[in-house]
C-alpha cells in the first residue's frame, strides 16, 4: 500500500492514526515486500504483531501458508477483515499482544515459525522480551523498530543501551540490519528513522531457562557489582562468590561489561545450584 491508498482507506472509515497506539503506517511497498521476504514467510508460518492496515500482511499472505496476526485496535481488525475476506491463510486475533497466550498459538505456528512486526517505540521492549523468552519455535524474525530501540539489539558491552534484551537477542539469534527507513516511508511521519532488523536463530544453542532471571538480577542496579546483584536470586554471598569464580568472572564486575557468553555460563552454572 502506498501513502495515497492508506490515506484514502483511513478517510473512507472516518479514521485518523491513533497516536496513543503509536500508529505509523508503512507506505513503501518495496520495503514491505523486502521485509516479508526477509522474515522467512516463504518457509514458515508467520506471527505478525500489529498488522495495522495490512501493508505488510498483504506481502506475508502472498508467501506464507499461515499468518496469525495480532492487532490491538478494533478498527484495524475490521479493516483487515474487509481487505482480506477470502484469505484462508489468515487468522486475526483482536487483543493486546502482551496479553496473548503464545502457548495457545503454538499449534497454529508449527514446529518452526517466523515473526514479523512494526513495533511502536513505547512497547518495543516488553514485546521483544516476550518473544525472546517465549517457548515458540521462532526460526526468524523481521522487526521494524525506531533507530534507538534497534541499537539495543546490536550494541556491544559497555554501552548504556546494553542490557537483558541485548544479551538474549545476541545469545539466541544472529542479528543483522536489513535496512534503514527514513520518516517519509511512513504515514504519519515519525520524528526519527526506523531500522529493520532480521534475527536468525543460532543452530545448536540450547535454551537456558535461568538466563532471564540471571539477567534481571544482574542489571537490576547497574552501578552495583554482580556479586551484589546476584544475591537477589536467593544466593548467599558465599554462593554468589563461588558461582562467579566457577564462571571465571570477577566479583567486582558489572553486568554492562560482560558479553552474552559470560551470562550464558552464569545461567548454566546457576541451574546446577540447589538454593
For each predicted feature, which ranges?
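Catalytic cores of RNA-modifying enzymes
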Residues: 1-217, 245, 256, 265-268, ...
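Active-site-proximal catalytic alpha-helix in oxidoreductases
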Residues: 220-223
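Short helix-coil junctions and helix-kink-helix linkers
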Residues: 231-233
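Short helix/strand-capping connector loops at secondary-structure junctions
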Residues: 242-251
Amino acid at each position: 500500500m502506498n501513502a495515497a491508498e492508506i490515506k484514502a482507506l483511513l478517510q473512507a472509515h472516518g479514521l485518523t492514526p491513533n497516536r496513543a497506539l503509536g500508529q505509523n503506517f508503512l507506505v513503501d511497498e518495496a520495503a514491505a515486500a523486502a521485509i516479508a521476504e526477509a522474515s522467512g514467510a516463504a518457509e514458515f508460518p508467520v506471527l505478525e504483531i500489529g498488522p495495522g492496515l495490512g501493508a505488510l500482511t498483504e506481502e506475508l499472505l502472498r508467501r506464507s501458508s499461515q499468518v496469525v496476526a495480532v492487532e490491538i485496535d478494533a478498527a484495524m481488525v475490521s479493516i483487515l477483515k474487509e481487505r482480506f475476506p477470502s484469505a484462508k491463510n489468515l487468522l486475526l486475533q483482536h487483543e493486546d499482544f502482551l496479553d496473548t497466550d503464545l502457548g495457545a498459538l503454538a499449534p497454529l505456528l508449527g514446529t518452526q515459525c517466523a515473526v514479523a512486526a512494526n513495533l511502536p517505540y513505547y512497547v518495543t521492549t516488553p514485546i521483544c522480551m516476550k518473544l525472546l523468552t517465549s517457548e515458540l519455535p521462532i526460526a526468524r524474525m523481521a522487526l521494524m523498530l525506531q533507530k534507538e530501540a534497534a541499537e539495543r539489539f546490536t550494541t556491544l558491552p559497555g554501552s548504556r543501551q546494553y542490557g537483558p534484551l541485548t544479551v538474549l537477542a545476541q545469545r539466541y539469534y544472529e542479528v543483522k540490519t536489513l535496512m534503514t527507513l527514513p520518516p517519509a516511508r511512513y504515514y504519519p511521519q515519525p520524528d526519527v528513522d526506523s531500522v529493520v532488523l532480521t534475527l536468525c536463530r543460532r543452530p545448536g544453542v540450547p535454551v537456558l531457562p535461568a538466563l532471564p532471571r540471571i539477567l534481571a538480577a544482574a542489571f537490576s542496579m547497574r552501578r552495583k557489582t554482580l556479586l551484589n546483584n546476584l544475591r537477589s536470586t536467593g544466593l548467599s554471598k558465599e554462593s554468589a562468590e563461588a558461582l562467579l569464580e566457577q564462571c571465571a568472572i570477577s566479583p567486582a564486575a558489572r553486568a554492562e561489561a560482560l558479553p552474552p557468553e559470560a551470562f550464558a555460563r552464569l545461567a548454566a552454572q546457576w541451574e546446577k545450584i540447589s538454593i
